[in-house]
Regions:
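N-terminal alpha/beta PP-like core and its mobile active-site loop of ThDP/TPP-dependent enzymes
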Residues: 1-319, 350, 433-435
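Phosphate/pyrophosphate-binding active-site segments
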Residues: 133, 157, 270-365, 445, ...
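Thiamine diphosphate
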Residues: 96, 104-111, 366-515
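Active-site diphosphate/adenylate-binding microenvironment
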Residues: 4-17, 22-25, 30-34, 323-404
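Short acidic loop-to-helix transition motifs that present clustered carboxylates
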Residues: 27, 48-53, 76, 364-366, ...
Length: 515
């Protein structure tokens, strides 16, 4: 077998059996290998940002990495924004990037670039293969690094001649999935701090948000009479009736400061200290008080489940039902005009059981999370890196990883345009995704940001930079042109009708919601 074939077989040995791909000339031997090894599901994406975002969504649902296949430095550069988001979400990805043949790089052909330099800011591990005999070993190392807890981005650069020359044997992947044990003295100190603090809080993220762990944290919180909070943006959170009602720290700086000011001690489990998303004139970057006592109890690489068992024993937690479990509370479907509040009520009423909600609703959806707390049990995925164009690609990956679950993609119209090519992949793969485009025909979030940075009377030129009118986007035409059936709605009644249709039918469907 050649080098590319040895890499594909190694990926399959390591349970990496999906490749989100946008190949070019340098990757043709890898593409050819896909004919021979049909267990690898290769999914074509028309833009590299769709491929990298899809790999992110896949990992969030399956907890195992997919691979990407990108073309040289410019192709990698096109995928950087969603690799950034994936890194912030701690998603594991085997990111394969084609390169010129080793002896061609020195010729400085038009597409020659510093691929390692481009990859490094969004990767935990970067390596260029130097021999076709080594590519399988390098591939096994990439898989191992991508699977380091909680998940890492491993970029493997594949020169053309290492793909076409005779390769070595496929390699087995030797994983090290051991989690770090939280020291007993740190747990003991936390017990004391929780008892002595006047107003403690538990801040959770990552693996602490897994349903079993969050349930145990809620029992601990009940015992010591303190609240649990989480970040505004989380990679994955299972919520809804029968699950813990997670309360997020507000996105808006003033609201976050107000919420957090009362807590003198914050126990951090799998999360990071609260900071503002941006810097603003005369507003704090750190959202807590200067004298807040932080106890970093467990990081994402720690055995959070084991730590919680020890902490529960030392606090004396009974096997009680936490009082923060959400009760089933389906809102009544409203009538009349469409606005953010009525949209949230429709979502709360109609989200099906075990659905996956990918939230890039931006300003329209600020209250959706809370409005769906009593809905049927479902999973919520947020953008952890803030780079827009996240939603539809992540929905692709989630649908591939979890084909038996309905995926709902909540999208702002401006954000969706960054990775609009995602619709074509949804159609080609017949993925079970219902897309809601919230068409406020503007970068509405930036209108608020103008005020936040002190611009009180923006002029015509400034406002034109935030408008998506003249011409207005026609999402129904765009979607149908990509092969996804679509409708436009401007009343709640029509939204309910077509949302029910999209949820009932298998396959992709888009609703343009006029605001």
């Amino acid at each position: 077998m050649n080098g590319a074939e040895s890499l594909v077989t190694t990926l399959l040995e390591g349970d990496v059996n999906v490749c989100f791909s946008n190949p070019g000339t340098s990757e043709m031997h890898f593409v050819a290998a896909l004919d021979k090894y049909t267990k690898m599901r290769s999914i074509l994406c028309l833009f590299e940002g769709c491929a990298t975002g899809a790999a992110d969504g896949y990992f969030r649902m399956r907890r195992a990495p997919a691979s990407t296949l990108l073309h040289l430095g410019p192709g990698l550069a096109n995928g950087l924004a969603n690799l950034h988001n994936a890194k912030k979400a701690n998603s594991g990805i085997v990111n394969i990037v084609g390169e010129h043949a080793l002896d061609h790089i020195k010729l400085n052909a038009p597409l020659t670039s510093d691929i390692e330099g481009i990859a490094r800011p969004v990767s935990h591990w970067v390596k260029t293969s130097k021999s076709s005999k080594d590519i399988a070993t390098d591939g096994a190392e990439a898989i191992k690094m991508a699977r380091v807890n909680p998940g890492q981005i491993a970029t493997l650069i594949l020169p053309g001649d290492t793909a076409w020359n005779e390769g070595g044997e496929a390699q087995k992947v030797h994983l090290n999935t051991t989690l770090n044990k939280v020291p007993a003295d740190l747990i003991d100190g936390t017990v004391i701090a929780l008892k002595e603090a006047k107003n403690p809080m538990i801040l959770v993220g990552g693996a602490a948000l897994e349903e079993k762990n969050l349930m145990q944290i809620a029992k601990i919180a009940d015992k010591v009479n303190c609240p649990i909070k989480t970040d505004w943006f989380n990679a994955r959170l299972d919520k809804g009736a029968g699950r813990i009602n997670s309360v997020r720290i507000p996105y808006v700086v003033e609201k976050a400061v107000e919420v957090l000011k009362e807590f003198d001690t914050i126990i951090v489990i799998g999360a990071r200290r609260p900071v503002a998303f941006f810097a603003y004139p005369n507003k704090p970057g750190v959202l807590t008080q200067d004298n807040t006592n932080f106890i970093e109890l467990a990081s994402l690489s720690d055995d959070i489940t084991g730590m919680l068992e020890e902490l529960s024993d030392k606090i004396g937690v009974a096997n009680n039902v936490p009082n923060t479990i959400s009760e089933l509370k389906i809102p009544e479907i409203p009538s009349g005009p469409i606005n953010p509040s009525s949209l949230g009520m429709v979502l709360g009423a109609l989200i099906p059981e075990n659905a996956i909600v990918v939230d890039e609703s931006v300003t329209t959806g600020r209250e959706f999370f809370a409005q769906t707390s009593g809905s049927l049990p479902h999973t919520w995925l947020n953008n952890c890196g803030g780079s827009i164009g996240f939603g539809m690609p992540v929905a692709i990956g989630a649908a591939v990883a979890s084909p038996d679950q309905k995926v709902i993609s909540l999208e702002g119209d401006g954000s969706a345009m960054y990775t609009v090519q995602s619709l074509w992949t949804m159609a080609r793969e017949n993925l079970d995704i219902t897309v809601l485009i919230f068409a406020n025909q503007s970068y509405k979030i930036l209108k608020g940001e103008l005020t936040n940075v002190g611009v009180t009377n923006p002029g015509k030129s400034a406002l034109e930079m935030l408008s998506l009118k003249d011409p207005s986007l026609d999402w129904v035409s765009v979607s149908k042109g990509m092969g996804v059936d679509a409708v436009r709605v401007d009343t709640i009644e029509d939204l309910v009708k077509y949302f029910k249709h999209g949820l009932k039918e298998k396959g992709p469907f888009l609703i343009e919601v006029m605001l």
